[in-house]
Regions:
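GST-like domain detector, emphasizing the conserved glutathione-binding G-site
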Residues: 1-129, 134-139
Length: 139
């Protein structure tokens, strides 16, 4: 049986969540760890943008976004019922995480002005507090 091929980068948060969903769903893949400085031509052959993660399915279908890879994997097998409540709520949380929170996190991580580190950390912490409160009832 031919396995899907996952192009990934170890530290990319989007690739990490794609790998997590594939692992959770029990989907075996061939992992192609790439160097961001030297991306392979076969990655560009299936995905013009050349970013990770990219999942190439045995039937030739290419999934180029981490969220789409996650949803595909969980649709194959959701043994612990991760998608048990309103999918729109979950997708909204992911959208907020990928836009607003990620921007503040990057500002904090890559900020070169020490004087506003606390302010930037506070912006990130607000999102984390919201996530934690919404998860409390499930823990």
């Amino acid at each position: 049986m031919k396995l899907p091929i996952l192009y990934t980068f170890r530290r990319c948060p989007y690739a990490i969540r794609a790998r997590m969903a594939l692992y959770y769903s029990g989907i075996n893949v061939i992992v192609r760890e790439i160097s961001l400085k030297n991306r392979p031509e076969d990655l560009y052959a299936i995905s013009k943008k050349g970013t990770v993660p990219v999942l190439l399915l045995p039937n030739g279908t290419v999934i180029e976004e981490s969220l789409e890879i996650m949803m595909w994997a969980i649709n194959q097998s959701d043994k612990d019922n991760w998608m048990f409540f309103d999918k729109n709520i979950q997708l909204n949380i992911i959208s907020i995480n990928d836009t607003h929170f990620k921007k503040h996190l990057d500002d904090y991580k890559y900020n070169s002005i020490p004087s506003n580190k606390d302010e930037l950390f506070g912006l990130c912490a607000k999102y984390l507090d919201t996530y934690e409160k919404s998860l409390d009832k499930y823990l």
